[in-house]
């Protein structure tokens, strides 16, 4: 199946679902943590699908696409650090901690694999021009005539 949108990407769907779960989980933290650790883990978890979507929007520039996948991977690691903090403060059980750490480990591996795929085989439109010109714009359409 051809990927038509970032919403077709497994890494986007998995990260979005995890971010929703983390959001719900964080609402059960003590009130004084709602704007501290609760806010931090919500932002880092939501950053992952956001970076994947933004990278997809820049997919015509391979290096930009990869950069945003790297940001998503970094946010995945950041979320795991926040999970360690909240487990250490006993806001979640050890079982919950292990459950989410394992799922974020899997997500990180999937993001890394997708990033490797993009690096090795993904051709931006600029790279494709030699074999498939696609839409070719005429620069004359952008010239300004003197009045």
Would you name each region that the model predicts?
Residues 1-147:
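Amphipathic alpha-helical assembly/interaction segments
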């Amino acid at each position: 199946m051809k990927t038509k949108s970032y919403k077709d990407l497994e890494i986007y769907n998995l990260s979005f679902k995890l971010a929703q779960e983390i959001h719900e989980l964080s609402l059960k933290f003590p009130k004084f943590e709602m704007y501290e650790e609760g806010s931090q883990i919500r932002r880092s978890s939501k950053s992952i699908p956001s970076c994947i979507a933004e990278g997809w929007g820049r997919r015509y520039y391979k290096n930009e696409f990869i950069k945003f996948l790297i940001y998503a991977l970094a946010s995945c690691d950041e979320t795991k650090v926040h999970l360690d903090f909240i487990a250490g403060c006993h806001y979640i059980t050890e079982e919950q901690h292990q459950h989410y750490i394992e799922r974020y480990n899997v997500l990180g591996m999937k993001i890394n694999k997708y990033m490797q795929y993009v690096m090795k085989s993904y051709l931006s439109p600029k790279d494709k021009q030699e074999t498939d010109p696609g839409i070719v714009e005429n620069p004359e359409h952008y010239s300004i005539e003197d009045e």
